[in-house]
């Protein structure tokens, strides 16, 4: 998977679906994914058009980084204030969203929070905001009801994702906000497969005998 900037054409979800694009859906890696960075990945596809695609891995933690430490590093809170964060904020995982711009934060969140000119409504249940203001709101307890923070994203060149899907690299299914925001990280892959109608154990057996 080559890295690239996020596509400029963030087509509205309804028109994207009509054109055969998959923004607002989950990509689920097939067993035997050639690129180890994406093995057993579940990716929420934020943008997909003729210009390419951009998504966030939602089931892999960033190495050695938690939310309180990140907020301290960004000077959003002081070290002494970390223990005073709301419980759900203090335990919010920081995800490894993908290999592109891996030092940049992206927040997928519920649509009850919006920043003008910064928040992209991807579908009825999920938005994307990539500014420090949303982290300040989360730290203050005034952010969205549901949110996950990821560092970096996955990007595809024009036509690249379509080719990978045709080569059986990815399955896809409608996104479930509960899976993205509430499921345990290590349960998301199997849960996404079951949403497609595939029992994970059977898929693993089939891959082993391919």
From Swiss-Prot:
Q: Which InterPro entries match?
A: AlgH-like
Query: Which GO cellular component term is one of those annotated?
Result: cytosol
Q: Spell out the Pfam families in the cross-references.
A: DUF179
Q: Which residues form a coiled coil?
A: none
Q: Which family does it belong to?
A: Belongs to the UPF0301 (AlgH) family.
What is the protein name for this chain?
UPF0301 protein M446_6268
Q: Which organism is it from?
A: Methylobacterium sp. (strain 4-46)
């Amino acid at each position: 998977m080559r890295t690239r900037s996020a596509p400029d054409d963030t087509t509205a979800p309804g028109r994207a679906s009509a054109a055969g694009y998959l923004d607002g859906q989950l990509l689920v890696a097939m067993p035997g994914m050639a690129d180890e960075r994406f093995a057993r990945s579940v990716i929420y596809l934020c943008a997909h058009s003729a210009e390419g695609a951009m998504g966030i891995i939602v089931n892999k933690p960033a190495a050695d980084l938690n939310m309180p430490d990140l907020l301290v590093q960004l000077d959003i809170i002081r070290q002494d204030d970390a223990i005073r964060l709301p419980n759900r904020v203090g335990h919010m995982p920081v995800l490894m969203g993908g290999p592109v711009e891996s030092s940049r934060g992206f927040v997928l969140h519920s649509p009850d929070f919006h920043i003008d000119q910064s928040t992209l409504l991807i579908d009825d249940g999920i938005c994307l905001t990539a500014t420090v203001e949303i982290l300040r709101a989360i730290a203050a307890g005034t952010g969205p009801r549901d949110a996950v923070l990821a560092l970096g994203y996955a990007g595809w060149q024009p036509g690249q994702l379509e080719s990978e899907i045709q080569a059986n690299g990815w399955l896809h299914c409608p996104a479930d906000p509960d899976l993205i925001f509430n499921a345990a990280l290590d349960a998301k892959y199997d849960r996404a497969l079951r949403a497609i109608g595939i029992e994970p154990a059977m898929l693993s057996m089939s891959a082993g005998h391919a």
